[in-house]
């Protein structure tokens, strides 16, 4: 029985109402425990955190760290790997490449080095679930899970057309059990299927009809959201709206929020969906965050993560095939596209965000507007949609921008003049507190994901803890934690990996109507390239540990 205490730290634990109070944190067998009643009880180790900031471990609820498109991007970017830092093997760590799409081991070391202990890949094709789990075995130090793509799934659309919501619900339950996934993701609902069937097609709005299936994106969003709530999944439908990146797409985003009809919905990388303007004229590009944020503020069924853009080179990777092709045409560089049988697609294109570009500068500003205009920090999560808007390594820079309006003004002064007239960021004076930073990077994502054992330092929580050295340089504070603990063990000390542990795979196992299995099997064996018996992950295939997260009371 291993017992440890973090003594006299300045604790930020918003889930338990602790805002900068000096407290001791007791840990035993990987969990937070109450302080012993006997004052003479001695722990095996004492960490003196006097003068230091103590928070729960960070949670990235939307990133891309595994799966086929991540691996395709790794192969596409040898030039990026060559000019980026190489992580050399040590007695504890494996070697790896970095850059915008780091290798598996490097990804985990870099995340943990920032104080993050949990991460979710946001878009895994069900067919690729087995390989994603195998990649997770090479991603130590983190607990991890993934969201399963279903917004262009042909079985789902077939049953929506047939007005068989009970089969949609049963299929999603079966799919999550088969893949050991965590949540349901919809990417450009219906649009990817149109792209696959027409070659260069897409949908332009929520009421366009998807070829051959005679359903609309609105019906897909509504049907999936209802099924997710009926299955009582811990995380709501995770929505990548139609028309990502297009001028004027804010109206599509607003209609998507309305299409949920009161069901829970998480709108992801919302920055990319908040643009004013004419789709045929980029000169009209601007922000419509105030209108969208007002709607989110008044509808408690909605949460968002931002997808912040930061300047520099990165890589766009998405389950949105037509978007990948659009970026290729705009940027003129490398491009990769792939169709995933009856399930999904993807597109990849390297991109460099430039300060001198009005569009890129506005994207940077629009992301910050979302953080500053959503009234309740519990309903907005930090993300860069790694690596789409920027690497997750940019999080300390973003935190510094949110906590210091002078710093924001200094960056604005370096951007094209027109930025100031096409967004409201110059007028926003709000500055985040450390408590609010703890919410959007830890407690809030945990609540959105339904992870009751993470994101806080209360009794029974996982003992995932980050200890920071406070100072005037906020960016420096968050990019180099003093200590990072995972399940009560010190993994990182001043940026150096001291111990490697595997972490756990997080997934759900919802109940579903097994009477639907014959229908699923019949359709599957008529259309797929693999047999249905080879599709589900079997329990014995898991070489690492896994945690089944229970459903919600919603």
Feature map (PLM): residue ranges:
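Active-site neighborhood of phospho(di)ester-bond hydrolases with catalytic His/Asp-centered motifs
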Residues: 55-61, 121-122, 269, 305-307, ...
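Histidine/acidic residue-rich metal-binding segments in metalloenzymes
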Residues: 164-188, 192-380
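Acidic, His- and aromatic-enriched active-site or binding-groove loops in soluble protein domains
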Residues: 143-151, 258-269, 406
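Divalent-metal coordination cores built from histidine and acidic residues
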Residues: 53, 59-209, 545-546, 550
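Active-site microenvironment of metallo-dependent hydrolases
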Residues: 1-41, 67, 74-75, 81-118, ...
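Flexible loop/turn segments at secondary-structure boundaries
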Residues: 66, 127-129, 153-156, 191-195, ...
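Active-site metal-binding motif and surrounding structural segment of the metallo-beta-lactamase
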Residues: 38-55
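A solvent-exposed, charged loop/short amphipathic helix patch at secondary-structure junctions
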Residues: 77-97, 199-211, 324-349, 404-422
